[in-house]
Amino acid sequence: MATRLQFENNCEVGVFSKLTNAYCLVAIGGSENFYSAFESELADVIPIVKTSIGGTRIIGRLCAGNKNGLLVPHTTTDQELQHLRNSLPDQVVVQRIDERLSALGNCIACNDYVALAHTDLDKETEEIIADVLGVEVFRQTIAGNILVGSYCALSNKGGMVHPHTSVEDLEELSTLLQVPLVAGTVNRGSEVIAAGMTVNDWTSFCGSDTTATELSVIDSIFKLREAQPSSIVDEMRKSLIDTYV
């Protein structure tokens, strides 16, 4: 089930947080309500880490990550990098990237298996994405927008993309990503999907302006009604143990 919340009267919750199946990052300095909303849903299951990136709080737009890794921009300080490495699970690789397009969250949309990337990212960056996140990388646009990370929210169960995405594009993207997709909005009509929400395989957090209709679409496409965190995390633990054995 999706949870509605705000970050200091701001509905762009995907700007101030990053949620994956292995960890959750939240911006430092938000109201306690913001942090406790994440805590009540996630605390028993995955670590919730308060952090800044490059001295800013817009962490969701600056980093990209999944259960395998976390990519942060070159503006990230050594102290922040060390804090993230200390706080995240041991199997999560934290990598700082020397990439000109430093708002990595705007340029990369990914789940645990595939990533959509900005068409102008360096070849080297593309290789790092594939290597650190353990994903197949596709350079794409979404409804003509190059900022794929802004206009797409993705989990292993489904995805939501820019509302003006054509049926042909939806089908093509869905085939690439191997998950069902829907064109939709958050925060009462906002097209910038990833800024207004953050999602993993069992829960989602959306801006408080998100309407009941938008919420039901989110619950439906990401299959949140049937999701159980414990079973998903157990599966992940099994797969991790298998890789170590």
UniProtKB/Swiss-Prot annotation:
Coiled coil spans: none
Organism domain of life: Eukaryota
SMART domains: eIF6 (SM00654)
Expression induction: Expressed at very low levels only.
GO molecular function annotations of the record: ribosomal large subunit binding; translation initiation factor activity
Pfam families reported in the protein's UniProt record: eIF-6 (PF01912)
Keywords: Cytoplasm, Initiation factor, Nucleus, Protein biosynthesis, Ribosome biogenesis
Cellular component GO terms, alphabetical: cytosol; nucleolus; nucleus
Subcellular location(s) per record: Cytoplasm; Nucleus, Nucleolus
GO BP: any one term: cytosolic ribosome assembly
Functional description taken from the UniProt entry: Binds to the 60S ribosomal subunit and prevents its association with the 40S ribosomal subunit to form the 80S initiation complex in the cytoplasm. May also be involved in ribosome biogenesis.
Family statement drawn from the similarity comment of this UniProt entry: Belongs to the eIF-6 family.
Stored HAMAP family: eIF_6
Self-association and partners: Monomer. Associates with the 60S ribosomal subunit.
Name under which the protein is recorded: Eukaryotic translation initiation factor 6-2
